Amino acid sequence: MKHSFEVKLAAVNHYLAGHAGIISTAKLFQLSHTSLSHWINLFLLHGPRALDCRHKRSYSPEDKLCVVLYALGHSESLPRVAARFNIPSHNTVKNWIKGYRKSGNEAFIRCRKEKSMTRSDDTHENEANMTPEEMKNELRYLRAENAYLKAMQEHLLEKKRQELEKKRKSSRA
């Protein structure tokens, strides 16, 4: 069930003012405590505008990949990851992770109409015959692939930094 911005804001403010706990506040406003918890996280991370979900959002392949890599590389819950990236539902993140595990970064590149298409590796031969739409799709694919590689490199570097930090701490002890 969708709730208005006003109801969300009133429930969050009621809880944050200390009038009641999450479960009591959820009962008072007749909503689920998980939704309220998510709204509180959104509000605390992004302010009141994050509670206004009137517009259907679309996310770039780079954004999706960034969220998935963050979720897989950190031990935060999916609702917390969704709140961190201002995504209205943790199920969106869950679906992105499923797609990523099934198809890798290509899960985010394909549009619904393009799902049956396969990417050709002999692009140099086909470049002269490509339509502008195919060129745009190729560019989108290469950008997403580049973003994926950069994100993966950053993820691996961060992991390496953490390992080095652990070694330093254990050698000092």
Curated annotation (Swiss-Prot):
UniProt entry keywords in alphabetical sequence: Transposable element
GO MF annotation list: sequence-specific DNA binding
Keyword Metal-binding on entry: no
Segments for region (Disordered): 115-135
Organism superkingdom: Bacteria
Family that this chain belongs to: Belongs to the IS150/IS1296 orfA family.
PANTHER family hit by this protein: INSERTION ELEMENT IS150 PROTEIN INSJ
Name listed for the protein in its UniProt record: Insertion element IS1397 uncharacterized 20.1 kDa protein
Organism: Escherichia coli
